[in-house]
A protein has these predicted regions:
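Alpha-helical transmembrane segments
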Residues: 3-19, 68
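Core segments of transmembrane alpha-helices
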Residues: 52-64, 115
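Cytosolic, membrane-interface loops and tails of multi-pass inner-membrane proteins
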Residues: 22-48
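Mid-chain, well-packed structural core segment of small domains
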Residues: 61-63, 67-99
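Small-residue-rich segments of transmembrane alpha-helices in multi-pass membrane proteins
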Residues: 2, 41-44, 106-121
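Interfacial loop-to-transmembrane junctions
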Residues: 90-116
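Transmembrane alpha-helical segments that form the membrane-embedded catalytic/substrate-channel core
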Residues: 12-29, 85-94
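Juxtamembrane boundary at the C-terminal end of a transmembrane helix
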Residues: 120-147
Length: 148
């Protein structure tokens, strides 16, 4: 089964991941810093933008993939995925500026809101149509019963 929403945004995330990596590498060469940030604040911020991306995107893609598989996909998932990618871009640009700023705050806040929303949606979908496990019907609020 092809998951077009998940594949589209996994591809977009891979491209963004490379872009964030290049932003770090382009600073490392002229600064001659191979490992760590060498005390350079700009490099440290770009490294954290890259790291934060790497920390948040995997759970987003897992949730997106399972929800698309469970629901067949819908406009809400497309919208959440578009907003998540835009939030990650905003966060990366916001990290270039020292201190808290609107891009950084909006980027991380929107990312967290989307992850929370997808997490709640996943839990709701999981119990919307109870699964059948080897002839055992499991329903919330009722005891399990054998099905023919």
């Amino acid at each position: 089964m092809i998951l077009p929403i998940t594949l589209t945004f996994a591809g977009a995330a891979a491209i963004l991941h490379i872009w964030l990596s290049i932003r770090v590498s382009r600073l490392r060469r002229p600064l001659k810093i191979g490992v760590g940030d060498g005390g350079n604040e700009v490099l440290a911020r770009r490294m954290r933008a890259h790291g934060n991306f790497a920390e948040n995107v995997p759970i987003f893609l897992v949730l997106l993939g399972f929800l698309e598989l469970a629901t067949g996909g819908n406009l809400w998932l497309w919208g959440a995925a578009i907003l998540f990618i835009l939030a990650r871009i905003a966060h990366a640009f916001g990290m270039d500026r020292p201190g808290a700023n609107p891009l950084r705050v909006a980027g991380i806040s929107l990312s967290w809101a989307i992850l929370l929303g997808l997490g709640v949606y996943a839990i709701l979908v999981a119990y919307q149509n109870p699964p059948i496990y080897r002839g055992l019907q499991v329903s919330p609020g009722r005891s399990a019963s054998l099905q023919p």
